[in-house]
Amino acid sequence: MADPPAGARALPIRAVLFDLDGTLADTAPDLAAALNRVRGDRGLAPLPYATLRPHASHGARGLVGAGFGVAPGDDGFPLLRDTFLAHYEAALCVESTLFDDVAALLAEIEARGLAWGIVTNKAARFTQPLLAMLPPLARAGTVVSGDTTPHAKPHPAPLLHAARELGVAPERCLYVGDAERDIAAGVAAGMPAIVAGYGYLDVHEAPARWPAVGIIDRPAALLDWLPPRG
């Protein structure tokens, strides 16, 4: 884990924006289960959870790719994607939970007088029901889904939209996510970004090379990067 730079507590951060899957919520168990149900429909054996977990932050594209070796544009991908999404929607929050200490982290962010919100590439049809089933997340000051703006991350539009909704200048927002596109979106939006190193990172990824200000190994470590109370 990278340590906060000297003077980090004096940074004029007024809002924290979070990715959802792999940052606030551990949704990989339900995403992997949905993918394996698609495989089961086709007479294929389930893939190990450890194989699928690193793909969970990449949505249907990543999971269907991992499960069937196809990509958007390939024959069969649209049907596999739609079947996967139907299975996922039918069992959206069976095993999904908040990561450890996320509820306490959000409460402390609020106690420090900071706004917070969620910016995810997950479509609203999945985002909104999931947040309702993970109550602390329903307090978010803004929720921007993958289809809220014309562009999804790594485009900066979703983050800029969230900043506008919170009434906070982009440079005074901090973005936290577990995928390279999250960090790219934050930088493009003019926001400092932090890697959620406890999320769904693949062993072949090199987050230390991403243009983030730091990496945290657990949610509570984010507090060291934020202004103190008062």
Regions found by a protein language model. Name each.
Residues T23-L24, C93-V94, W116, D147-T148, ...:
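A generic structural signal for short
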Residues D26, I118-T120, V195:
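Hydrophobic residues in well-ordered beta-strands that form the structural core
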Residues A2-P4, R9-A104, R112, A123-R125, ...:
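N-terminal helical cap/lid subdomain that shapes the substrate entry/recognition surface
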Residues A45, A115, P192:
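Residue-level detector of anion-binding/catalytic polar loops
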Residues L17-D19, V119, V176:
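Generic enzyme active-site microenvironment
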Residues A2-R14, A50, A124, Q128-G230:
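Asp-based, Mg2+/Mn2+-dependent phosphohydrolase catalytic module
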